[in-house]
């Protein structure tokens, strides 16, 4: 994957535009997310490990909001399910184009990987096939809050017995002191990874109108309302978490 350093917000901007997954972001995305999301590499690699426990023969494994395909690659490395395929979907044409390049490179390095389709489209309009694993890796937070329950309900309906949704998200906290502490710690994490205060502030301004995080309890209650029977947090680092939701 690209090793370009994220410098998108390094210079003062007279007007900070809303964050978008455009070509500029795609070019530096691996660096950006590694330096911005604590625990991201651990989440991605273990998504493959977890998926191998839930994958069922002759089903689909979905990577919804697949970006450059890091989760898709992890699924293909770890899952050996007869008749399984991975479907990765993203609404950014720049992401989809680069994702296909990376997956073609993966095909050239490894044998016996699951077949994969990479689609450009809106996951809200996706016609789900019977699925045993659905990964929503830092995707739900970019969907309008009023549309989240319906999407989760459709995912639940698509899951076969023994399958699972794996949901990773940034968290917000109802307690003001807890929110302030975790925000400060996250800023410290980004500083430690080389981001300046200007970059941190401008990125926050760019993303606050397009990313709307929920609390852990909001996630739990919504998943239960969507028909899931059990919600199990398996990972948290600072204000980022990953959950397993069982049908």
Curated annotation (Swiss-Prot):
**Any one Gene Ontology BP term:** tRNA wobble uridine modification
Taxonomic superkingdom: Bacteria
InterPro entries documented for this protein? CmoA, Methyltransf_25, SAM-dependent_MTases_sf
Q: Which reaction does it catalyse?
A: prephenate + S-adenosyl-L-methionine = carboxy-S-adenosyl-L-methionine + 3-phenylpyruvate + H2O
Please give the name of this protein: Carboxy-S-adenosyl-L-methionine synthase
**GO MF:** carboxyl- or carbamoyltransferase activity; S-adenosyl-L-methionine binding
Q: What does this protein do?
A: Catalyzes the conversion of S-adenosyl-L-methionine (SAM) to carboxy-S-adenosyl-L-methionine (Cx-SAM).
NCBIfam families per UniProt: carboxy-S-adenosyl-L-methionine synthase CmoA, PRK15451.1
SUPFAM superfamilies under this entry?
Answer: S-adenosyl-L-methionine-dependent methyltransferases
Per the record, the gene is cmoA
Query: How does this polypeptide assemble, per the annotation?
Result: Homodimer.
Q: Which family does it belong to?
A: Belongs to the class I-like SAM-binding methyltransferase superfamily. Cx-SAM synthase family.
> Gene3D superfamilies, alphabetically?
Vaccinia Virus protein VP39
Say which enzyme class the record assigns: transferase
């Amino acid at each position: 994957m690209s090793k370009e350093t994220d410098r998108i917000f390094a210079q003062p901007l007279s007007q900070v535009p809303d964050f978008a997954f455009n070509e500029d972001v795609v070019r530096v995305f691996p660096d950006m997310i590694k330096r911005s999301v604590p625990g991201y590499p651990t989440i991605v690699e273990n998504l493959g490990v977890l998926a191998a426990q839930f994958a069922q023969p002759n089903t689909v494994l979905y990577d919804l909001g697949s970006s450059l395909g890091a989760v898709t690659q992890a699924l293909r490395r770890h899952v050996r399910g007869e008749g399984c395929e991975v479907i990765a979907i993203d609404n950014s044409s720049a992401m989809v184009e680069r994702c296909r390049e990376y997956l073609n490179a993966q095909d050239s390095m490894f044998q016996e990987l699951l077949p994969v389709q990479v689609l450009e489209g809106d996951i809200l309009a996706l016609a789900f096939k019977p699925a045993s694993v659905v990964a929503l890796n830092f995707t739900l937070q970019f969907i309008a809050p009023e549309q989240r329950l319906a999407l989760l309900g459709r995912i639940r309906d698509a899951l076969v017995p023994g399958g699972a949704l794996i949901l990773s998200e940034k968290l917000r906290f109802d307690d003001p002191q807890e929110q302030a502490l975790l925000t400060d710690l996250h800023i410290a994490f980004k500083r430690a990874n080389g981001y300046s205060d200007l970059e941190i502030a401008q990125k926050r301004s760019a993303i606050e109108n397009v990313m709307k995080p929920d609390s852990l309890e909001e996630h739990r209650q919504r998943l239960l309302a969507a028909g899931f029977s059990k919600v199990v947090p398996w990972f948290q680092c600072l204000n980022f978490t990953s959950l397993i939701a069982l049908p």
